[in-house]
């Protein structure tokens, strides 16, 4: 039940950010994963807590989009299991932190990915 709440909360946060910044982003949401894509970027947010499901989901994404950015949003993150499984994650947001810190972290990732590239 908590995973569903976390998933829909994350979906609302992402939609709000996209609306505020008027980004040309397409959202596809299928629990436990939210996919955002533009012409240049593929970004996935995963809200899984079970390590076996995380590994399977990340590998499935990598087969479809090799250069996609994957962010794990979950409590109780086991960093050693992620390292041992050689999962390539763009970032990890620990939801055991206070809500404001989680929001700031999510906004930092979104700003980094969707900011205009200055050459």
Which residues does each PLM region occupy?
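Output/docking surface of receiver
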Residues: 74-79, 83-119
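Short, surface-exposed basic-aromatic patches at helix termini and helix-loop junctions that form
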Residues: 19, 61-64, 85-87
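A generic structural signal for alpha->beta connector loops
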Residues: 20-24, 67, 89
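Two-component/phosphorelay signaling modules centered on CheY-like receiver
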Residues: 4-29
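Short beta-strand/turn micro-motifs composed of small residues
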Residues: 1-5, 72-76
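Conserved phosphotransfer microenvironments
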Residues: 11, 36-70, 76-80
């Amino acid at each position: 039940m908590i995973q569903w709440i976390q998933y829909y909360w994350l979906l609302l946060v992402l939609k709000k950010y996209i609306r505020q910044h008027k980004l040309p982003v397409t959202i596809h949401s299928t629990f436990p994963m939210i996919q955002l894509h533009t012409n240049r970027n593929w970004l996935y947010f995963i809200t899984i807590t079970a390590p076996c499901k995380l590994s399977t989901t990340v590998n499935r994404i990598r087969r479809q989009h090799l250069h996609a950015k994957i962010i794990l949003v979950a409590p109780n993150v086991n960093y050693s299991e992620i390292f041992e499984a050689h999962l390539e994650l763009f970032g990890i947001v620990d939801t055991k932190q206070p809500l404001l810190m989680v929001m700031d972290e999510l906004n930092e990732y979104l700003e980094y990915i969707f900011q205009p590239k200055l050459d």
